[in-house]
Amino acid sequence: TSKISTTYEEEGRQSKIQPRAFVITRSGPTSRSSSYSARQSYGSRSSITPGVYQQLSSSGITDFRGTREKEKREMQNLNERLAGYIEKVHFLDAQVKKLEAENXXXXXXXXXXXXXXXXXXXXXXXXXXXXXXXXXXXXXXXXXXXXXXXXXXXXXXXXXXXXXXXXXXXXXXXXXXXXXXXXXXXXXXXXXXXXXXXXXXXXXXXXXXXXXXXXXXXXXXXXXXXXXXXXXXXXXXXXXXXXXXXXXXXXXXXXXXXXXXXXXXXMDYAEFWKSELSKCVRDIQSAYDEKIDIIXXXXXXXXXXXXXXXXXXXXXXXMQLQHVQEEVKKLRTQAGEKNAAYAEXXXXXXXXXXXXXXXXXXXXXXXXXXXXXXXXXXXXXXXXXXXXXXXXXXXXXXXXXXXXMELEIACYRKLLEGEESRVGLRSLVEQAIGVQGRGTASLKDTIQQSTASGSMTVQRSSKGPIAFNSVDQSGSNIVIENTTSGARAKTQSLKGWRVDKTVAGRVAASIELKNYDLPPNTKYTIWAKGAKDRATADNEQIADMFSLGVG
């Protein structure tokens, strides 16, 4: 049978329910088992019965069936360690992937930078710009790189025209991507600088200005930068028509900014636009002065030539005089036209300035109104708070009164239930309390009896280490204790624990325990407010309730 039991343990756990197939026979006293024959079918192990084994193991003697259990435990440990390793491997794998992605991004950026640095030839720079534009469609960071590339191209200044074209393309790309508004503004500024350097492509500069205006329409935040760029373009351009276009663009920008004035308040708008408009006006005036000077110089030269010719021949002089007079007329009409245009522009500027001032005044008025409304709201809130405080005081008074009223209500209810027999107040009170006067001396005794016979349940058991030890009948204190002992003994911090009092399924009061470490098998007392003045030991606490519950 010993061999049978070992094979049983190696095979693992068979079902405990086995058919009784063995034959019970009477055997000789010499035979080993007197109850039944030793020829047991199946390996019903005769080593130890399950009940005995259970008792032994619960009393701490375990190693009867030891080898198998040890194997099981070792397998469990190995499995846990394997799971830990697998988790680590997953984590490292994720980190490696992240680092690889970062490396790739860094390499791409480095490659782009290297390409920009290496491209000395104009064609190579143009190709790099095209590549950057393609990247810009892909990502915003690439757009920043494109801006850097444009700056590099401007610095190289190998082919100014090509650089301008590339800048225009970059500006278009920036316009396409609304996300990189700031980048677009920077690109526009770069484009303006490039246009100034080129100075040949005035039309390109105008286009850039238009693009800047569009960008301003797209993002009002960059409007100031756009206006500055427009002013720079106006200064750079010598052509009067271009200047007029720039002025129109500036006016449009001013209108847009005036519309956006209410949105954000960073600086006094009226002053800012006044200074900006005066700048523009000054530029225009200087341009017109130059034009008039040139015209006058040309007229003087023509007159000198006419005088020299007149000295040569009188008839020819008469003819030339007529010509000169015609020329002077033409020039005068031109000057008149120019002056009229300038006056118009000045009038428009004045009107825009007036509009800006009006908008600023309106904004100030709105702000004042908002402040007044806020003050009124604050006053209303204060009044409401005072009312709420008064209501809270009234509620407290009502709650105090309610307790006194409940007994009276019970008595009146008894009266109303229609007992015809005239009943004394005392028996009424006894009925309400639920006590028949068992020869008690006075009403006070009955009430005390009823409080003693009332019921209050306390949660004695607890899942955690802390349980109730005792609860005072008169409601003056509650004692809790740390019940851990033996191997599970540990100190428990009371921080964050509460003692709740529930009445009819609703939490009537909850007491937050103070931050105190309660060692095992130690008590902690919670006193009601009137029962004790102050905590004498540090394992005590005074609650802010007058009674913790009676009964």
Swiss-Prot record:
Residues 454-551 form the LTD domain. SUPFAM superfamilies: Intermediate filament protein, coiled coil region, Lamin A/C globular tail domain. Keywords: Acetylation, Coiled coil, Cytoplasm, Intermediate filament. Residues 1-54 are annotated as: Disordered. The modification N-acetylthreonine is found at residue 1. Can form homomers. Residues 75-106 are annotated as: Coil 1A. GO terms for biological process: heterochromatin formation; nuclear envelope organization; nuclear migration; nuclear pore localization; protein localization to nuclear envelope. Residues 121-258 are annotated as: Coil 1B. It comes from Helix pomatia. Epithelial intermediate filament protein. Residues 107-120 are annotated as: Linker 1. Residues 424-551 are annotated as: Tail. One of its GO terms (molecular function) is structural constituent of cytoskeleton. GO terms for cellular component: cytoplasm; intermediate filament; nuclear envelope; nuclear lamina. Residues 25-47 have a biased composition (Low complexity). Residues 276-423 are annotated as: Coil 2. Residues 71-423 form the IF rod domain. This is Non-neuronal cytoplasmic intermediate filament protein A. Residues 259-275 are annotated as: Linker 12. Residues 1-74 are annotated as: Head. It is found in: Cytoplasm. Belongs to the intermediate filament family.
